[in-house]
């Protein structure tokens, strides 16, 4: 199952140093039956975009609670076995899931991160005009430099 983990630069740096996301369980976002019903579509691309957007909103909340980390949203896309994902949807969060296991780096598919120029807007809570940029896994260490 493709999951979207909300993160920050600090969380991403720790995952890279530790070889993955080791402090399970995690709140993540995914294409769920509840998300399908809420959006009324079976378009996988649209559903994945919505799940990633929900993770980006959660990343912004994490940033608000972590003023010492760079003000750039981070969403990590990963493939995990269905058996480690539990439903955690709510009316206001139809894509939310709970990941009950560690997510090793080998399961990470990509990361989606705000451009550095977006940081002032992100810090001020104005994220709606900023799309996340896609980064391949081999680019992640350079992203943090």
Label for each model-derived stretch:
Residues 43-58:
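Short, structured active-site "lid" loops
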Residues 1-44:
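Long, hydrophobic N-terminal alpha-helical segment
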Residues 67-74, 78-145:
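Glycine-rich, aromatic-bearing surface loops/beta-hairpins
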Residues 28, 55, 74-78:
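Generic structural hydrophobic/aromatic packing signal, biased to beta-strands
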Residues 22-26, 48, 94-98:
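Short, low-complexity, polar/charged sequence segments that are solvent-exposed and flexible
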């Amino acid at each position: 199952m493709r999951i979207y983990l909300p993160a920050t630069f600090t969380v991403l740096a720790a995952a890279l140093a530790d070889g993955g996301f080791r402090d399970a369980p995690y709140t993540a976002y995914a294409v769920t039956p509840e998300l399908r019903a809420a959006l009324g579509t079976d378009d996988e691309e649209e559903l994945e975009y919505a799940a990633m957007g929900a993770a980006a909103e959660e990343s912004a909340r994490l940033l608000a609670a972590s003023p010492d980390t760079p003000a750039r949203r981070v969403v990590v896309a990963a493939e995990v076995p269905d058996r480690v994902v539990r439903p955690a949807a709510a009316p206001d969060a139809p894509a939310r899931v709970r990941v009950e296991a560690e997510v090793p780096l080998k399961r990470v598919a990509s990361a989606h991160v705000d451009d550095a120029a977006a940081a002032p807007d992100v810090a001020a809570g104005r994220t709606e005009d900023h799309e996340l940029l896609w980064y391949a896994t081999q680019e992640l260490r350079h992203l943090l430099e």
